[in-house]
Amino acid sequence: MAYFKLEFGFGRSKSEGKISDSANQADEQAVLEIPGWDFVKGEVERAKQEGRFKVAGNYLTAARSFTKFIGRSDWLFSDMTAEKLESYQRWLLGHNICQNTCSAYMRALRAMHHRALPFLNIAPFSKVFTGRTKTEKRCISQSEILQLKALPLQPGGSLSFARDIFLFSFYAMGMPFVDIAYLKKSQLRNGCIYYARHKTGQQIQVALLPAMLEIIMRYEQRDSEFVFPILSDKVENSVSSPSVSAQQHRQYTARLRQYNYNLHQVSKMLGLAKPLSSYVVRHSWASIAYLHHLDISLISKALGHTKSSTTFIYIKSLFDSDLFEANQSLMQDLGL
């Protein structure tokens, strides 16, 4: 590109500089006219080849949303002006898309914009929100865990299975669904579960409790290498491996979607104000462990967090209730 000519054109004459400047402007304009969807498809395919399927999905979802806003599929990167993106943000919020989801779309579009136009000194995303807002605490109480366990469900049914996986995750110190799905029998030894957390790569060891063994035995598959009947035996590689196929990822995401749907149905049966999900169980274990005075460093280690600050996000809202109770006790002592 002319960018390199302009940047490294030492010792040139003024006339040469003018020619290079003109050529640079022409190149910049040509880059801005790149068909957006053509570039998106290339980025999605590249991310899939690298095993970054979540990134690929984020790119695709954001591009589809922007295309719907623009109203045509032949949009160009020149359409991503600051004014247009501000309008897009208002459009998203007007369609009841939450701020964090809007921000996720903007970050995905910004990443693709930067890859397509890395050398252009333009910042169309400077006026839209790309951060993260505080979300409502997603956890249930200890009594609600006990209600869930006691809920009469048809043995062998999909709702019963979802409930059992949720409880297994809770018993296993908030073990993520992805790690449960890919859990192999070879990872169970010496009365413990040994696994590397998919998201962070942190090595975690969990003691196998009787309640966990009961659930494992309930769904035992003699001819499968997996502990639970979530993935088929055709899935040979760990989800954390770069060689994991798109087909394997699609199978996992389909199972996760079904799991969360079934948990939502169970939530209705229990009359819970906040629906159960694969995220709720981790927040719930962390919150209940903290209320039972488990050290924050141990909670962080159990969850596979690389930073304790991440764990504080899980339990931060509990501090508010602690302050409320402390103040209430103080007022009572003062006779107020």
PLM feature spans:
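Basic, Lys/Arg- and aromatic-enriched nucleic-acid-binding interface segment
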Residues: S126-R138, Q142-F177
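Short, basic (Lys/Arg/His-rich) helix/loop patches that form interaction surfaces
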Residues: P155-G157, Q251, N260-K301
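N-terminal DNA-binding recognition helix of tyrosine site-specific recombinases/integrases
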Residues: S65, G94-S126, M175
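Catalytic-site neighborhood detector that most strongly recognizes the C-terminal catalytic loop/helix
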Residues: C139, R197-G201, L303-Q328
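DNA/chromatin major-groove-contacting recognition/catalytic segments
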Residues: Q205-P210, Y219, K316-L336
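Active-site/catalytic core of tyrosine-dependent DNA strand-transfer enzymes
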Residues: L209-A273
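Basic/aromatic-enriched alpha-helical hairpins
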Residues: F8-F10, S15, I19-G94
